[in-house]
């Protein structure tokens, strides 16, 4: 079964802001003036250095432009190229790294309005995540309220490594707003760099940074479970984006084991954590951190205990695979269909309105 014939839903596409000038028309005048006066040139995400090989596949790069900055190229290469009927835009412009809560909120508003006008209005296959200023949970919840009426926004986007563990109750206004509107919360690889990306200090190399993101996802997933987010918001879905997933079986076993022995301190977690995670957490497919030949990947998926966990993604334009190999070839046809179509539709209720 070819990936090109199934009409999948790509759950992780990265549109790039070509330059800060593109957002000026969407910024409040106060902040447009501040950009000019302060000489702000761009808000490129440090988590994805512009010229690092990972940031863009060689055949998806364009001389003199940011990979992902052209809507036409993104739709041609990522949607047409893989036969996808729809794609979710996760914009990683570094709004969450700003120290000013008000400035972050202004840029989040501008970025979401830019996505709506320059991307969603111009291709009916595109959907997007709401970028929010995580620096201020009340302002983030306000941005969710502002944008939730536009049904083309199907998710709320947070960075994996922010100022604090994501389960903390100070962040619950974000989850409450998302749950009220039926929006999953997507947690994407990346850091605001308020803290080291490893538990023992700052690394020397980008390789260390990116590899350690998987550990960051495990930390945040533990926080969400143990702090009671899933217990408080039982309808909430969380999607770990670009997290990898092959670490999940061992992680579930460890979390379950120590919950059994220590659950007296977290009585609100009143059922086994693996059960909670299998019901309320999903993972995008790329990167696949396992051999795609042989049965290793199938054994990992079997150990994870559910065929509903994975959502198709290319991670465009990030370089996670070559050619058309976005979907591991040895997966059973029934599982391919679930990853490509059924699981995304079950995770994102708003997609069912147009693509079911």
Summary of predicted features, one role per range:
Residues 1-356:
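Helix-coil boundary/capping segments in enzymes
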